[in-house]
C-alpha cells in the first residue's frame, strides 16, 4: 500500500493572519489505474474575519478569504517510467471539477470558470492557474459578496494543488463600513498579489 504524501505547508514566515482550519488525507478521485490520494491543508485568514466581525458587531462572522494546499499521491504507485508530470493532463480536468464542486459545497453560487493563466514559481517551475468567479450569499448579511477563486496545479517531483478565494471588492466598501483596518480596505489586486506570494512561498 502506498504511503500518503507529506503535506504541502506554508512556511512559518507566511502565516501572518492565516490559521489552519483543517487537515486531512482523503481519496480525491478515481482513475482507471487507481486512486488519487491527497494530503490537504486548509487555511483561513482569521485576521480579516476578526476585523469584519468586530465592525459588524458580530453580524458577519464568516470566512471571506481562504487558501488550501494539497499534495497528491497515487495508490497503487505510478508504474516505472511514468512520471507525475505525465499524469497532470489527466488530473487537471478532474481537479477543476472537484474544485467547482467544493465551491458549491461551501454555499457559493454563480460559480463559473472565467480564465486561465500561467505564472512562474522559482526558476524551474511554472504553475497553470484557472480562475473562477463566485458569489457568497453570506447568510445573515444584507448584501452578497463577489469572490475571485483560483485553482493551480503543478509538479516538482510530486503533483501539487493550491486553491484560494477572496473578495473582488474592498470589504469596507461592500458593507459600508468606516474602517481604518487594512484587511477591510484591500482591493482585488491586493488580494491577488498576496495569493501569488503565497504560491511562490510554497517553493
Residue ranges of each PLM-predicted region?
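Short secondary-structure junctions
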Residues: 13-30, 105-118
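Signature of long, low-cysteine stretches enriched in small and polar/charged residues
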Residues: 95-150
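A short, hydrophobic, proline-anchored segment that marks a local hinge/packing element in signaling
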Residues: 150-156
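Secretory pathway targeting signatures of secreted, lumenal, and periplasmic proteins
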Residues: 16-93, 137-139
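Well-ordered, non-membrane alpha-helical segments in soluble/globular domains
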Residues: 90-99, 188-195
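Secretory targeting signatures
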Residues: 1-10, 203
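Surface-exposed amphipathic alpha-helical segments
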Residues: 162-203
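Short coil-to-beta-strand
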Residues: 157-161
